[in-house]
Structure formats: C-alpha cells, structure tokens
Amino acid sequence: MSEYIEHSPSGTSVGRVEKRFFTVAEADSPLTVESGRALGPVVLAYETCGQLNERADNAVLVLHALTGDSHAAGYYEPGDAKPGWWDLMIGPGKPIDTDRYYVICSNVIGGCMGSTGPSSLDPATGQPYGLTFPVITIGDMVRAQKRLVEHLGVTKLLSVVGGSMGGMQALEWSVRYPDMVRTAVPLATTTKHSALAIAFNEVARQAIMADPNWNGGNYYDGVPPAHGLAVGRMIGHITYLSDEAMRQKFDRRLQDRCENSFVLEEPDFQVESYLRYQGQKFVDRFDANSFLYITKAADYFNLEASHGCGSAVAAFAKAKCRYLVASFSSDWLYPTYQSRSMVQAMKKNGLDVSFVELEAKWGHDAFLLPNARLSGMIARFLDRALVDAAKEDARAL
C-alpha cells in the first residue's frame, strides 16, 4: 500500500494539523497482546480534525494501511510539500467532511511514526526493543485504538473507515466492539490474508532479514538494513499496481537511454527505475523491524478464525453496523471475490450492506486515488449515518 501517492489537491484542506500522543497502557498496567506478552507503556500517535459535536455522535475513525501513519489530512506546516495521505477524501466539503465530522486517525502499535513499536525504547533495558518487541495482531491494534477513542470522549463511532490493512481494522472493529460502531467502510480488503498475500509478505521479510546490516533486528546503533528494506518495498509495489497499470505507466520503455545498456547493475527499463526509486524513498521514512511486525500482523489476520470458529457467517453474527464495502476490478492482492464472500456472510446475518466493485486500472492502490464514484458513495453513506444517529439520539431523550 503506497500511502504517499502524488495527487493534485482539490477542495479545501483542513489546514494545519498537529500530531499528538496518548498513553493507552502504562508500565504498571500493561496491554496484554494476543501473543500473551504484556506491553507497557504503549503510546499511540494520533491526529484529529473537525470538532466533536455535543452529542458526541459524529466521530469517524480513519484507519491507515500497511505503512501509513496518523497524518491522513492537512499539513504540519504551511510550506509542506504534500498533505496527509488521504487529503483528497478528508476535509471541508470533501466526502469525509470535517465541517460535519470529527475525524480521528492514529498510527498503529508496532509502527514507527510515533506509536510504540520495535524501534521504541524498552523501559527494562533502555535500548530499542528490536525483536524483543512482542508479535502483534490486527486485534491488538484495534484494542489500543479503542482506548484512544474513549479517551477522546467517544463512546460510539459514527464510522470506521479504511482501505487494505485499514479495512481489516475496520472489520475487526465491527465485530470486536459492535456496540461502538454505527457503520463501517472496508475498502480493498479481505477477511483473511490469502496464501498469495502471505507469500509476497514473506519474500519481503526475507529480503530484510538477509541484509547483513539487519543483525537480528539489532541495528539501531549502526547501519540499518536499507537494501533489504528497499527490496521488500519493491516487492510490495508490484502487488499494489496491476498489469494494465504497468503497461500504461511503463510498458517496456527504457529509462534515459535509447538502447539496452548490457550492464546487469543498471536499470534499463522505466519500471526498474521506478521500483528502485520507491524502495530508496521508503527507507528514509520507515523502520525495517516495524515492516516485519506489521506485515506479520496482516498475515495473521483471519476474522473467521478469531471471531467465528472458521466461519465468516459466524464472525459477522456479532456485528450490528451498516457496511459499505468496495473492491476494485484490477486489485489482484485482494481481488473482488474476497469482498463478495464477506458481503455474502454479512447478508446471511441480515446486515444492511452496500457493495460495489469499482472499475479501476490502477490495481490495489486505487482506493487512494481520486474516484468520483467512490467519493460520492462514501459521502452519501456517512450523511445517512449522521442523520440516523441524530434520530436515534432524539428517540433516547
């Protein structure tokens, strides 16, 4: 999931935002993760925009994808080169309208963008955790987010919205905390990682661990495994695009030359140069150990096993919310059949579900790109949710 896709800003930005931090678990009252380990303190980095209304019923939790962060919209400083990773969707007058909704986005635990992860200091040693950091799950991420949401004064979310791994978190929220979620918008996602998705992640992890600078995860005082992480990212980028996208964007065009170089170390083709650029850019902002932990959390994700004893129908029997599910025609990482399967399980439980497969040539990353149809659907879906919430609140008076 290439969270920082270039796009032309449209509409009005939320303007300047501030990254904040909240301790969701202390050292003396740790968070026990699903692997059985106790973790504390646990800090989440988060950002908000918009205002929580008096009824506290307009909060939308936006959930980031694999290597994203809390910076979903706006700018830290007026001169920043680019806004948050979903600025095209979040802001005044945009589908997730910050004039109407209170938007929350946090960096997941295990991350490296301000939340507690393997690069954080272990209070027991004063050194970075490295591989002593406990293995985490999507469920652990959501449990930490729940504490943040409650801290912010929200007892019931208007919606949980996310694509890719963010969609996994949205699904987890909907069945783990059904009384806290009015609606959910899982985009380009799945109820369980397929063998194909696991395979790509494993190859990426092996690339990192094969880098001699990885040093068993203990590289924080030395040279990081930049080459291995870059190769891992290159593998990921292949899965985020599609055959059609690659043909249109690159085809077999050469990079800065008119004929083959006949030098193995040189990137002859534009697609080679693109992948190398994306890999090198990634190592400047992401921690290799976090990549290992978060990809493993995605691989472990299996909503059917964790909440339904192997049955998607049984898992969604716990849910109470309305869903808007969207897949993309060229997404071969989480293809449409996986979304159709989850929608069928939802409907077998009598849940209110809207589903659309959107025609898009750009592959898995299409959920991050401008799409008028998707934008309109999300805007209308949230509008209805807010109206329904107001009616429900009025009946409760």
Swiss-Prot record:
Pathway in which the depicted protein is active: Amino-acid biosynthesis; L-methionine biosynthesis via de novo pathway; O-acetyl-L-homoserine from L-homoserine: step 1/1
Protein's UniProt keywords contain Plastid: no
Enzyme class, first EC level, given as a word: transferase
Protein EC: 2.3.1.31
Cellular compartments per GO CC: cytoplasm
Protein species of origin: Solidesulfovibrio magneticus (strain ATCC 700980 / DSM 13731 / RS-1) (Desulfovibrio magneticus)
InterPro entries in UniProt: AB_hydrolase_1 (IPR000073), AB_hydrolase_fold (IPR029058), HAT_MetX-like (IPR008220)
Assembly and interaction partners: Homodimer.
Major location category of this protein: cytoplasm
Name of the protein in its database record: Homoserine O-acetyltransferase
Family: Belongs to the AB hydrolase superfamily. MetX family.
UniProt keyword annotations, A-Z: Acyltransferase, Amino-acid biosynthesis, Cytoplasm, Methionine biosynthesis, Transferase
Active site: residue positions: 164 (nucleophile), 331, 364
Catalytic activity: L-homoserine + acetyl-CoA = O-acetyl-L-homoserine + CoA
Any GO BP annotation: methionine biosynthetic process
Entry's localization field: Cytoplasm
General function of this protein: Transfers an acetyl group from acetyl-CoA to L-homoserine, forming acetyl-L-homoserine.
Domain AB hydrolase-1: 58-368
Annotated SUPFAM superfamilies: alpha/beta-Hydrolases
Lineage: Bacteria, Pseudomonadati, Thermodesulfobacteriota, Desulfovibrionia, Desulfovibrionales
Keyword field contains Amino-acid biosynthesis: yes
